[in-house]
């Protein structure tokens, strides 16, 4: 599996270097250390199995994540009382690069987030600045002080420190990269709209 994780890392480096918004947000560290993390294959991640990407530019990354999915340390962060059972059945993420990721670094965090169709990722915030980059599917991105936007593959969305934001999927799933460039230990908090 290590080779496949390295392939994923290399494909993401290539995507990053070819996207001005991503490369201006933060540089990806060159000194990542592979970390063999205990897999945690959660139910929502299994929904990736039969999902085909239609974006030629990101298809390779999508397909590698699909192949690796059973070997990834998927997480959910939230409790049912805060976000509801329905949300948790359609949501998962993992840290690919970061202090506890599949590749270790303290310079930034890079997460992969999966949202199934017909899902609402409630309003939340955190101290870390972040940028979303959609790999597959689409979602409606909303944030306080900004216009909402439907993001499709190759599109980005920046969130300032403590800026409340939410995501909604409709008839499509959404697979995204999410980078934090500072405050890597930020707590994610659900906020009232």
Provide a role label for each language-model segment.
Residues 145-164:
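Short acidic-glycine-tyrosine-enriched beta hairpin
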Residues 112-118, 125-141:
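Short, conserved beta-strand element in jelly-roll/cupin
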Residues 108-110:
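Membrane-proximal helix-loop-helix units in multi-pass membrane proteins
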């Amino acid at each position: 599996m290590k080779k496949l994780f390295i392939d994923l890392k290399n494909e993401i480096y290539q995507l990053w270097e070819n996207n001005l918004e991503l490369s201006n947000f933060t540089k990806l560290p060159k000194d990542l250390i592979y970390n063999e993390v205990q897999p945690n294959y959660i139910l929502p991640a299994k929904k990736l199995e039969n999902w085909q990407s239609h974006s030629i530019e990101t298809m390779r990354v999508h397909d590698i994540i699909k192949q690796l999915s059973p070997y990834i340390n998927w997480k959910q962060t939230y409790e049912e009382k805060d976000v509801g059972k329905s949300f948790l059945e359609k949501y998962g993420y993992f840290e690919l690069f970061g202090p506890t990721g599949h590749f270790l670094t303290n310079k930034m965090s890079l997460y992969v987030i999966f949202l199934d169709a017909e899902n609402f990722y409630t309003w939340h915030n955190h101290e870390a600045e972040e940028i979303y980059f959609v790999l597959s599917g689409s979602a409606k991105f909303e944030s306080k002080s900004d216009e909402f936007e439907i993001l499709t593959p190759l599109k980005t969305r920046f969130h300032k420190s403590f800026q409340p934001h939410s995501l909604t999927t409709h008839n499509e799933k959404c697979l995204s990269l999410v980078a934090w460039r500072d405050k890597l230990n930020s707590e994610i908090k659900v906020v009232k709209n």
